[in-house]
Amino acid sequence: MLIPKEVKSAISQLRKNNFEAYIVGGCVRDLLRGAAAQDKALGEPRPAEAGREPEDWDLTTNAKPEQISKIFPRSFIDNKFGTVTVLTNSKNPKLKEIEITPYRIDEKYTDKRHPDSVKWAKNIKEDLARRDFTINAMALDIKSEIRSLKPETNSKFQTLNSKFILIDPFDGQRDLRNKIIRAVGKPEKRFSEDALRMMRAVRFATIFGFEVEKMTREAIKKNAPWIQAISKERIRDELIKIIMADRAADGIELLRKLGLLRYILPELEEGYKISQNKHHIYDCYEHSILSLKYAAKRNFNKYVKVAALLHDIAKPRVKRGEGLDATFYGHEILGAKMTAQILNRLKFPKKEIEKISKLVRYHLFYYNVDEVSESSVRRLVRQVGPENMDELLQVRMADRIGSGVPKAEPYKLRHLRYVTERVSQDPISVKMLKTTGNDVMKILKTKPGPKVGQILDVLLGIVLSDPKKNKREFLEKEIKKLGKLPEKELKDLAQESRKGREKLETKRDGMTKKKYWVT
């Protein structure tokens, strides 16, 4: 993998001014993961969990913020920790900005969120010691151009014609190879500095498919209540990253096992061990997790995934009775209200709250091919919003698989898709014309009657054959011509036009049926 020229240039500039400079943190982790996967695959396509190009590039140096700014005139200091954002001329969005942070040591964390103050560290190892996990506490010292990384030793890596040194005082490379999430130093101290790190441990384990090391796990279990000190916005952002991961269901379950879920989504944990009825083989919590698992497998969007996780959130509160005949009447109505409350608590945007709540509210819609009319489908589309119908059906699919049924989209759901598209299509009618019955009467100086409708029918037939002719000027000329035709001839033309329209409607309906494999 090539180190981008923008990154190498920034390192070079710092070194020319007699400062140290290293690539650091998550981008080193991603570089090593990508190289390891590539080396293992021997040129074959890399697996989904393989490393990827870093989302951003972070550098660290022994230069102070003012010194960095002097070296890079197109830069600004953007926080109290001395991070300097350097602007580049790169066309790559990921490289338009490069963050350079001085070596630092974080002082006491009173609020378990941010250091009360920072002081500059003497060397790179002191800086790495303040970081969260060993896999993020590595730095890369570029000695010359790097073409690929091959992590097979502890300190040096050889490439075809260049070399570099990995600064790895906490054995992050070993943990990376062994797929371990381990806190740097004492886990409890790391989490007391920033309690959100407990969620980050879950997020990294979820995204990478890693295990959380025992001492790190125990520290999270012991100190899970600390997460309450974190702002809801930061919790929301971490939660969404977990939900959007391929292994989202595993991530939510890990939050529960580590004792974090009760402080993040206590309503979801209420469903743990709450049995359902004859229509379900899983308890309320398991059903929600499995619904999310299917949504993740199908790569549905964020709204569907959140709705899949929360769609039965109210079941524990409305449950009546036990065993096979237990009921959950109204859970979709209360569930929509609870979903709105949860998302509002987590500071989701208002539009997202409305959309996801609506998906929860209507996820239980009733549809049987021979029992539900088109007017009922129109009403559902109107209530949910045509823009949300696909997502509602996806939530229903996730709900079905989460219930243990073998088929996500049975015939009746495909048929509903067909009817939904059919009722949402613009009808083929004279309303499509760029003229009206009033125009016909005005041009021909006539009164309302069959002749007006016949002329509009003929005009529609002309426009359906050639949509470009649906222009007011052309239609006015045609109205004058048609107005001169004998009554019978005009009547026959109108009838022929209506037959053509019916054929077109039948053809369109047939294509829609074929699209959804229904009859």
PLM regions: where:
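Catalytic cores of the polymerase beta-like nucleotidyltransferase superfamily
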Residues: M1-T519
